[in-house]
A protein has these predicted regions:
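N-terminal secretory signal peptides and thylakoid transit peptides that target proteins
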Residues: 1-15
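C-terminal segment of N-terminal export signals and the immediately downstream linker at the start
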Residues: 1-2, 20-59, 65-68, 72-75, ...
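C-terminal substrate-binding/cap subdomain adjacent to the FAD-binding core in PCMH-type
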Residues: 13, 178-346, 362
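Short glycine/threonine-rich loop-to-helix capping motif typified by GTGT followed
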Residues: 18, 267-269, 315-326, 373-386, ...
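Glycine-rich N-terminal segment of FAD-binding domains in flavoprotein oxidoreductases
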Residues: 50-147, 161
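Structural signature of FAD isoalloxazine-binding scaffolds in flavoprotein oxidoreductases
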Residues: 63, 93-114, 166-186, 213-217
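Activity-critical C-terminal alpha-helical subdomain
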Residues: 320-324, 333, 421-471
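Substrate-recognition/cap regions that form aromatic- and gly/pro-loop-enriched pockets
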Residues: 327-434, 442-444
Length: 471
């Protein structure tokens, strides 16, 4: 596909449309009042996502070449009552970026890296974070926050938040966005930032795609570390893990902090703290000083010193393994939440006591570590109302494709979520279980009116992103 064309994949054929000034392809369909039925590989792919739990077939898949293409599509679809969803890398886990009977925008066709400056980078929304990093690193720069998995699209993470191991210092990826180009649900092309259309800026970031489609993002950059000294520490129990996690969060000894509860393969759990110190290779950290005062099982500690790029490739190695054994393609009924710091240990321990290794799978994990909530400023990223919150995520990677077992896990997610919510926990909306509008109202709490009012202004016909069943 050339850069000035878009491709609508339909009925096993490829209809090509020139720029919007010419009434061909999609524009011709709009003028003729025709919405063609669609089949083919693109539609089949758009009916699936990484979760492999929900299957919703769209009527069409559009690969846009520009924001103008998307604006034209939005006007056409809205006039016919068709729903539209933007899809990046398809790593939703519960059909959130599907549009049954509607149109899916395949944003991988818009992935250009436009400009790298000393403090920022401008990229298309379909670019992956790995591509952003590849463009920034030769300049000695990096985004402040990167997700563990770098093959997610920029637009895909910015509509949910985007958490990573440096969130304790820099907040979410949405806290490090300088400006966004957006096509609204009613077809307007707008730029938004803290100083231009700020209401749209606040509704787009972590707004779950309800008010507009990100087409380009200007992202903050910071100097990249040269090397990373990584410390994987293991503990006898949840209590000792939590105590040390709180210690290192408070004293700030680590530049990166995460942690996990891992299946040991014999029915028990391993408790892991994952910390990292950035350095330039000249003044390397002293391991004994870094680990002073901690109560880990020191003989089990795994300490490694890597380049920054090597450190960021850890999940790529896991991806390769899961693809080779087929588990990458199994259902992924994940549950991602944040616990209040004041009751995280008790609540996590109670839930853990009711789980077994098979509930997460041999390569799964339960993410558990503290972070300061003061680092987060995106209005629609919801957090417990305390200074410290703990991500608590059931990263389930089942060993089989057993659909009945996956359905049980989805039902279990709902039960666990209600329990956490009743205890002051908050959902991170990259989770596999159904949510009603009342659930979403409860989730957004005092911010619900911000999103609802923006929806009425920018997507009054509720054309966008129906998979959340929010409006």
């Amino acid at each position: 596909m050339t850069t000035n064309k878009r491709t609508l994949l339909c009925a096993g054929l490829t209809a090509t449309a020139a720029p919007a000034a010419k009434a061909t392809g999609l524009a011709a369909a709009a003028k003729a009042g025709v919405a063609p039925s669609v089949a083919g590989d693109a539609v089949t792919a758009a009916a699936e996502d990484f979760g492999h739990l929900i299957h919703r077939k769209p009527q069409a898949v559009l690969k846009p070449a520009s924001a103008a293409d998307i604006a034209e599509l939005m006007s056409w679809a809205a006039s016919r009552g068709l729903r539209v969803a933007a899809r990046g890398q398809g790593h939703s886990v519960f059909g959130r970026v599907m549009a049954e009977g509607g149109v899916v925008l395949d944003m991988t066709s818009m992935r250009t890296i436009h400009d790298v400056q000393p403090d920022r980078i401008s990229v298309d929304a379909g670019a992956t974070w790995s591509a952003v990093l590849d463009a920034a690193l030769p300049h000695g720069l990096t985004p402040p926050v990167l997700t563990n998995y770098l093959e997610l699209s920029v637009g895909g993470t910015l509509v949910v938040g985007g958490i990573g191991p440096t969130t304790l210092r820099y907040g979410m990826q949405t806290d490090n966005v300088l400006a966004l180009d957006v096509v609204t649900g009613d077809g307007r092309q707008l730029t938004c930032s803290p100083n231009s259309n700020p209401d749209l800026f606040d509704a787009i970031r972590a707004g779950l795609g309800q008010c507009g489609i990100i087409t380009r993002a200007t992202l903050r950059l910071v100097p990249a570390p040269q090397r990373v000294r990584r410390f994987n520490l293991f503990y006898a129990d949840l209590r000792s893990l939590t105590a040390d996690q709180r210690t290192v969060l408070t004293d700030g000894r680590f530049d990166q902090l995460q942690g996990a509860i891992l299946p040991d393969g014999a029915g028990a759990w391993r408790y892991q703290l994952e910390g990292a110190v950035h350095h330039d290779g000249q003044a390397a950290p002293d391991n004994d000083a870094v680990l002073a005062g901690l109560s880990d099982q020191r003989s089990a500690a795994v300490i490694s010193d890597l380049t920054y790029s090597e450190d960021l490739s850890a999940f790529a190695r896991l991806e390769s393994l899961l693809r080779s054994n087929g588990q990458w393609f199994h259902p992924h009924p994940w549950l991602l939440t944040f616990l209040r710091g004041s009751n995280a240990e008790q609540l996590a321990g109670d839930i853990l006591a009711e789980l077994n290794n098979s509930d997460v799978g041999p390569f799964g994990r339960i993410t558990y570590y503290p972070m300061f909530t003061k680092a987060l400023h995106t209005p629609l990223v919801r957090m417990p109302d305390e200074s410290v919150a703990f991500p608590f995520n059931l990263i389930r990677i089942p060993a089989s494709k057993d659909a009945a077992k996956a359905d049980q896990m989805v039902a279990g997610n709902r039960v666990v979520y209600k329990r956490l919510r009743d205890a002051g926990g908050i959902l991170y909306p990259v989770s596999a279980f159904p949510m009603s509008q009342n659930d979403w109202k409860d989730h957004f709490g005092p911010r619900w009116s911000l999103l609802r009012d923006a929806k009425q202004r920018y997507d009054p016909l509720a054309t966008l992103t129906p998979g959340y069943t929010m409006f």
